[in-house]
């Protein structure tokens, strides 16, 4: 009997609902991924990651209720297996990307980049890969 490959469970933390919905739909078209939830408020991210048992998180730095940057360390400490991919529309800054990675983000992808770059960042090193 052939073993079924586990789907990569992706949570989206994005304050723009239209973009979040589009990302969710695109993720769900991938054969190895499934969107397990969407949140817009910084205060909901950790609980949603736990509840959905997400393998990977797409994290916008500008969320309702606060910045996503401080969340990175909290998430990395509480859920060390969670792959955090920052997806930000802020003008790319080496300093911001470096700080995000220092706090525990696995990757930093700028909004406007081809979606395949984000998908590849989610896949790299994930526990479901």
What are these regions, as identified by a protein language model?
Residues 14:
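Conserved acidic carboxylate
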Residues 38-56:
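Acidic, metal-coordinating helix/loop segments flanking the phosphotransfer/catalytic sites
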Residues 41, 67-70:
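Acidic catalytic/metal-coordinating carboxylates
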Residues 60-61:
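Active-site residues of response regulator receiver
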Residues 64:
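The feature encodes the CheY-like receiver
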Residues 69-81:
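Short amphipathic alpha-helix used as the core "switch/output" element in two-component signaling
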Residues 70, 91-109, 113:
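Alpha4 helix (beta4-alpha4-beta5 surface) of REC/receiver domains from two-component response regulators
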Residues 87-88:
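Hydrophobic/aromatic residues positioned on beta-strands within the core alpha/beta folds
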């Amino acid at each position: 009997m052939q073993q079924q490959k586990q789907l990569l469970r992706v949570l989206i933390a994005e304050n723009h609902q239209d973009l979040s919905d589009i990302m969710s739909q695109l993720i769900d078209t991938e054969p190895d991924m499934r969107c397990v939830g969407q949140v817009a408020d910084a205060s909901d991210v950790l609980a949603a990651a736990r509840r959905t048992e997400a393998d990977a998180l797409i994290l916008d730095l500008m969320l309702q209720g606060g910045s996503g940057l401080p969340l990175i360390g909290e998430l990395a400490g509480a859920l060390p297996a969670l792959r955090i991919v920052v997806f930000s529309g802020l003008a790319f800054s080496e300093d911001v990307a470096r700080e995000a990675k220092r706090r525990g983000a696995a990757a930093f992808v700028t909004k406007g980049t081809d979606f395949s770059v984000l998908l590849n960042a989610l896949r790299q090193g994930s526990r479901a890969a």
